[in-house]
């Protein structure tokens, strides 16, 4: 077909039996189609790997660092078992890694606009850790990774400790 829109149209009108595409785009479209009452599924087989991540403009290294470290912090929080509902229990931790995660700005931001020492607490309070955000974005959001449109367990989207490729450098 000519483009992704045409492929989708052919699939929906029955001209073809299978429709492939970028996983994140297919998930977004599947949500819309389910809202229209269609019972469709995304098959687990991947034809290609298309890593996606946050992007920032080229000329703002400070902003790029903040975006990257928010991601690393969300991963690190999950590794420590810290999430959007319990991070307050860890604020006074004597574990140096947890203390850096929750109580240090890591030198991020700019001289005129540095991050606060509690920036990661703000992130966790707003969106949670990586698990929380994934569950809310790709699953039913009940906290149990149920009814996921893109499975995480056993895939590259999981933490390194669980066989995936998601990891973060030390928070320093």
PLM-predicted stretches and their roles:
Residues 5, 9-13, 65-72:
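Solvent-exposed, polar/charged alpha-helical surfaces in well-ordered, non-transmembrane soluble domains
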Residues 37, 50-53, 150:
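A near-ubiquitous, low-amplitude feature marking generic local secondary-structure context
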Residues 44-121, 130, 167-172:
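Extended ligand-binding regions for polar small-molecule ligands
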Residues 7, 40-44, 163:
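Residue-level marker of intrinsically disordered, low-complexity segments enriched
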Residues 107-172:
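C-terminal functional modules
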Residues 1-3:
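Short beta-strand-to-loop elements that line the ligand-binding cleft
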Residues 5, 12-41:
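A ligand-binding cleft/hinge motif common to bilobed small-molecule-binding domains
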């Amino acid at each position: 077909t000519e483009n992704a829109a045409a492929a989708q149209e052919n699939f929906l009108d029955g001209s073809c039996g299978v429709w492939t595409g970028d996983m994140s785009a297919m998930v977004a479209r599947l949500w819309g189609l389910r809202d229209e009452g269609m019972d469709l599924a995304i098959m687990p087989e991947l034809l290609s790997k298309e890593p996606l991540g946050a992007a920032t403009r080229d000329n703002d290294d400070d902003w790029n660092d903040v975006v990257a470290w928010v991601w690393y912090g969300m991963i690190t929080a999950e590794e420590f078992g810290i999430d959007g509902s319990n991070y307050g229990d860890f604020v006074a931790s004597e574990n140096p890694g947890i203390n850096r995660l929750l109580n240090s700005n890591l030198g991020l931001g700019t001289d005129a606009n540095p991050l606060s020492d509690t920036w990661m607490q703000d992130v966790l309070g707003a969106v949670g850790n990586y698990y929380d955000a994934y569950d809310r974005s790709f699953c039913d959001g009940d906290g149990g990774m149920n009814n996921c449109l893109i499975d995480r367990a056993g895939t590259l989207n999981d933490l390194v400790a669980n066989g995936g490729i998601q990891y973060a450098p030390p928070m320093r």
